[in-house]
């Protein structure tokens, strides 16, 4: 006899689970683990960037710049700022009267 035939049997109304309401400790533990897994998976998908950045860099805000000359740090900051700045030449100004 397979596990499927022991747990679920077809009825007139559809599929019914015989183990609902069971007080078996294994069923209760499996249910709790399943619910916790679902909650953790949802939280992981919602906050994965923050979580993994925190794990990778710890309490620091990003990669360490220790040992890098100040001129290179300033050059890097300038490159990052230029990448963020918007080029106004790509936009068309439309004035409505």
Curated annotation (Swiss-Prot):
Any idea where this protein resides? Answer: Virion membrane; Host apical cell membrane
How does the record classify its membrane topology?
Single-pass type III membrane protein
Query: Membrane spanning segments where?
Result: 23-43
Primary localization:
virion
Intravirion topological domain ranges are 44-97
Q: How is its activity regulated?
A: The M2 protein from most influenza A strains is inhibited by amantadine and rimantadine, resulting in viral uncoating incapacity. Emergence of amantadine-resistant variants is usually rapid.
GO molecular function ontology, one term from the record: monoatomic ion channel activity
Region annotation Disordered: residue ranges? Answer: 61-80
Which Pfam families does this chain map to?
Answer: Flu_M2
Among InterPro entries, the record links this protein to: Flu_M2
Its domain of life reads Viruses
A GO cellular component term found in this entry reads: membrane
| Record keyword Plastid present | no
Q: Does the keyword Metal-binding apply?
A: no
Residue ranges in the Virion surface topological domain are 1-22
Q: Which residues carry this modification: Phosphoserine?
A: 64
Q: Where does the entry annotate site (Essential for channel activity, possibly by being protonated during channel activation, and by forming the channel gate and the selective filter)? A: 37
Site residues, Seems to be involved in pH gating: 41
Q: Which family does it belong to?
A: Belongs to the influenza viruses matrix protein M2 family.
- Quaternary arrangement and interactors, per the entry? Homotetramer; composed of two disulfide-linked dimers held together by non-covalent interactions. May interact with matrix protein 1.
- Task of the protein: Forms a proton-selective ion channel that is necessary for the efficient release of the viral genome during virus entry. After attaching to the cell surface, the virion enters the cell by endocytosis. Acidification of the endosome triggers M2 ion channel activity.
What name does UniProt use for this protein? Answer: Matrix protein 2
Q: Which organism is it from?
A: Influenza A virus (strain A/Equine/Tennessee/5/1986 H3N8)
């Amino acid at each position: 006899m397979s596990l499927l035939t022991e747990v679920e049997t077809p009825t007139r109304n559809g599929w019914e689970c015989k183990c609902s309401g069971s007080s078996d400790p294994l069923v209760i533990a499996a249910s709790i683990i399943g619910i916790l897994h679902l909650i953790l998976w949802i939280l992981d998908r919602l906050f994965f960037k923050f979580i993994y950045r925190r794990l990778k860099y710890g309490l620091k805000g990003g990669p360490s710049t220790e040992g890098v000359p100040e001129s290179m740090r300033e050059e890097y900051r300038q490159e990052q700022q230029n990448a963020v700045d918007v080029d106004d030449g790509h936009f068309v100004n439309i004035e409505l009267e």
